[in-house]
């Protein structure tokens, strides 16, 4: 399957190269279509489906890490504000409430 796809891609590149020799405008137009066409994107994802899976996995990990970092930073801010302002405990409590909402 991979060999067939590679052959088709090489044949297309030769066709585009021939069109550039005959007419440059047509060649550029075809190249733009090849770069942006959704059909080729689907073919690329089929031939290399593992790349799509990796993207999902990475995004999940990144989102999880970002979420954890936000929580940690929130806790650090709470502790720092509590230690810094021991006299003003009312302000600290309101900050905790806003932190829990996020």
From Swiss-Prot:
Pfam family, one: Protamine_P2
Any GO BP: spermatid development
GO molecular function, one term: DNA binding
Subcellular location: Nucleus; Chromosome
Modified residues (Phosphoserine): 8, 10, 37
Region (Disordered): 15-41, 66-102
A cellular-component GO term for this protein: nucleus
InterPro entries to which the protein is assigned, alphabetical: PRM2
Tissue-specificity statement: Testis.
Keyword list, A-Z: Chromosome, Developmental protein, Differentiation, DNA condensation, DNA-binding, Nucleosome core, Nucleus, Phosphoprotein, Spermatogenesis
Family assignment from sequence similarity: Belongs to the protamine P2 family.
Task performed by this protein: Protamines substitute for histones in the chromatin of sperm during the haploid phase of spermatogenesis. They compact sperm DNA into a highly condensed, stable and inactive complex.
Assembly behavior: Interacts with TDRP.
Official protein name in the record: Protamine-2
The gene coding this protein: PRM2
